[in-house]
Swiss-Prot record:
The gene is rpo10. NCBIfam families: PRK04016.1. It is an enzyme of class 2 (transferase). Zn(2+) binds at C7, C10, C44, C45. It comes from Hyperthermus butylicus (strain DSM 5456 / JCM 9403 / PLM1-5). Its main location: cytoplasm. Part of the RNA polymerase complex. Its EC number is 2.7.7.6. HAMAP family: RNApol_arch_Rpo10. This is DNA-directed RNA polymerase subunit Rpo10. One of its GO terms (cellular component) is cytoplasm. Disulfide bonds: none annotated.
């Protein structure tokens, strides 16, 4: 839902890469090349960034029920 702060598997901090990764991929660059240039080498970290879906915009449309 929110940006991944750390890799779910190894715990490496990833939040500092998210904005640049997202903007470059939305600009049409190859995600593989972007991750290589950012220095994200571990496959678990790459998976965490590639698989993230920013669903917070969809979820916040719903009314909060307690």
């Amino acid at each position: 839902m929110i940006i991944p702060m750390r890799c779910f598997t190894c715990g490496r901090p990833l939040a500092q890469y998210w904005e640049e990764f997202r903007s470059r991929v939305e600009g049409g660059e190859d995600p593989r090349k972007v991750l290589d240039e950012l220095g994200v080498k571990r496959y678990c970290c790459r998976k965490t960034l590639l698989a993230h879906v920013p669903a917070i915009y969809e979820v916040r449309k719903f009314k909060r029920v307690l």
